[in-house]
Amino acid sequence: MAADTTKKQFIRIRGANVNNLKNLSVDIPRDQFVVLTGLSGSGKSSLAFDTIYAEGQRRYMESLSSYARQFLGQMEKPDVESIEGLPPAISIDQKSTNRNPRSTVGTVTEIYDYFRLLYARVGIPHCPKCGREIKKQTVDQMVDSIMSFPERTKIQLLAPVVRGRKGTHAKLLEQAKRSGYVRVQIDGNMYELSEEISLDKNIKHNIEIVVDRLIVKPGIEKRLSDSIETVLELAEGLLMVDTMDGNIHNFSQSFSCPDCEVSIDEIEPRSFSFNNPFGACPDCLGLGYKMEFDIDLMIPDKSLSILEGAIVVTGWQSCTSEGSFSRAILDALAREYDFSLATPFENYPEKIKDILINGTNGHSVKVYYKGQRGEGVYDVAFPGLIRNVEQRYRETGSDTMKQEYESFMRITPCKTCKGQRLKKESLAVTVADKNIYEITNLSIEKLKAFLADMQLSEQQLLIGKQILKEIRARVSFLSDVGLDYLSLGRATGTLSGGEAQRIRLATQIGSGLVGVAYILDEPSIGLHQRDNDRLLSSLMKLRDLGNSLIVVEHDEDTMRAADCIVDIGPGAGEHGGQLVAMGTAEDLMKNENSITGAYLSGKLKIPVPAERRKPTGFLTIKGAAENNLKNIDVKVPLGIMTCITGVSGSGKSSLINEILYKRLARDLNRARVIPGKHKDILGVDQLDKVINIDQSPIGRTPRSNPATYTGVFDQIRDLFAATADAKARGYKKGRFSFNVKGGRCEACSGDGIIKIEMHFLPDVYVPCEVCKGKRYNRETLEVKYKDKSIYDVLNMTVEEALTFFENVPSIKRKIQTLYDVGLSYIRLGQPSTELSGEAQRIKLATELSKRSTGKTIYILDEPTTGLHFADVHKLVEILKRLSEGGNTVVVIEHNLDVIKTADYIIDIGPEGGDKGGTVVACGTPEEVAQSPVSYTGKYVKKYLE
């Protein structure tokens, strides 16, 4: 019987019901580039990650022994009837970025491992003190080297027994004389050992014993070899050869510097690992930085006096009031050193500031204390604010207190290694005149050029050829996915989701696997339109190797390049989970049911505003120089919506998140943050609040949900507490909280589920038997509002709740904003852990529902992440609403539909990394479109037509 080949050509999914999928059946072509698209919340990720990937992983796990499975953590079987033709699956999503401070681009791509091997095998060690090259040679190599001197050269072999040490060294000289040696060289002068030698014991001396004198000629090899061995024994592996013409040749049996008496260990790959004690800087343990208390965070406003509360660090706030021990110490210091606690801190002389910050240097002061803890006189040697707080930080066992103290710390480069992470001996090893830190801190673009032009000796090339081939290939893959501006030393914790995903994509291309299903989640995030083609060609390369690519994506270019598009919908949440259309971009355009097709064909489009609003003022950032910013001045308009654009790595986040947001947060919100490098920001007085609407989760536990985050749950609980039934039972609003005892089910502590550990099977979460997953006890659930219990309300979607509460204006207003930002499908009580993609829009809705001051600045970083064309359409309307009434909206964005609707654009560039950091163009979208040097202008021009 012939095999059914159609099964092999497709991943055949039947009856998928994961999350909101409605018994979905679809045949996804194998070995092709397939894009899954649809509205946000339509079920794309449920199909790609929770069904296809989950089942692929589960089947692989099933093939392992139960012993191995207990360490790996099992995956639950997805709710699907069958999946046939499923290849092994690899997921490249955005959530699994490694936030470990020891993880870098180099370590996650394993390029750094190859560099460690290269440096260990062909690196040239140098003395970490004087910088001279250190060579390690065997006796035979030394003999060959000396025999290569011109014939008849007179040489003497010297044993350097003392290098730069004080003393008379009489014993050593006597010992040399007894051993039969005749001459000795001291501080460059030759002496006979038979004469009286008297050395000044207070001066550092160099002493070399003359072991042999020879003339270079054939036949002396045996004698030369014996003499060298004698020298090496006397001088602990060192040999000096004086050629009588004043030239000294140094030889070493180990890696040691004859001048500085510095020895270095055998060079191995681990010598270059900052995660290994053999290579890491001993001071910062390979982190490259230290967390240190910062006096600018401890005393942020130096125009205040101590009595007015200048010292804000934990443990010292009480020094403003009489009766605290901290106040008694400061009173004692003021008496001893004659200063007043009522003087503004900035007016103290440097000596007084130093005493307060760094202490009395062991000098005790008399502290008179009278307070709640009794009274007495104490002798206290004040260690200074910094050391005192350091001690408290070390001694506290409370995580909360540790976090509190850490808010007064800042990251400073390690003083020992200058932020280079390795010990000095490892940093003194070079390849092509660069140490490993210098090489890994080059941008990928520069590194690629450096590797191409690398000058190595014949022997180095012979040894390092294969290693260099691997390095060059992997560096090229990083370049191909548009990451030229990154360096291998960049910490992975500082990467955006899109960057981290593209790095993992480059690693997978490098692995060269075949027959795998790669499942990706919006790889184009954070990528400028200019770099999209490179990303697409990388994806094609992965497909052409013989792999299946399933990409969840909203980017138009990616859809048009795909072999097949699967459109899930038609709506979001309850209204999604079905197959709407499938085929090429052209097929979708012809399909009347596909909203995606309508946007691709241009039937639906986001309109360009008829007119651009004029700014009401400007914020002027002076001398911005954080990261790659080139000391630039930037004017940010107020009262309108501004888009900050530019290629990846151009400096957008440095300007907006590091400088503008942190400076405004410090000045307006009194946040304990240190802004990026800049001179000043003018015009801050025109604002009263800054809000950063980022993509971080709205909560880290399942107890946090949209209702609690937006604050609407408080009003819903008030409503339930106001019912006649609740009043009759004496229930207050706290009764309707699942976080406190009283109304919640105590069997599951209000979680609704109970976790059962299963060892080598996955942990099982079962609904609580007592409350049946409803989180509240029976009495609380008996209280109804319009025939619905508090559980029923939490289980409503935003759309259902909007109708249910239409006669309660305060509640309706908050729920309406969730609906307006496109979140009609989420449930009010849905755990925040299930809402990672929706977090930013929930925050947007929360801000929209607040009363506007007209002097607020909102900062958003790529709000279109995870949004379909139709969702972007809604977002544009929301951003316009936010900036009404005098508020300012600043958006970092690559999406051209958002950029074209902005009132103003500031384009940073022209390139990423070192070639970026300047303002390329600014003005309305129409003005920027005319700029001959702006990449953004070139692309936005097409969207304005």
Q: What are the roles of these predicted feature ranges?
A:
Residues 1-945:
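Conserved phosphate-binding elements of NTP-dependent enzyme cores
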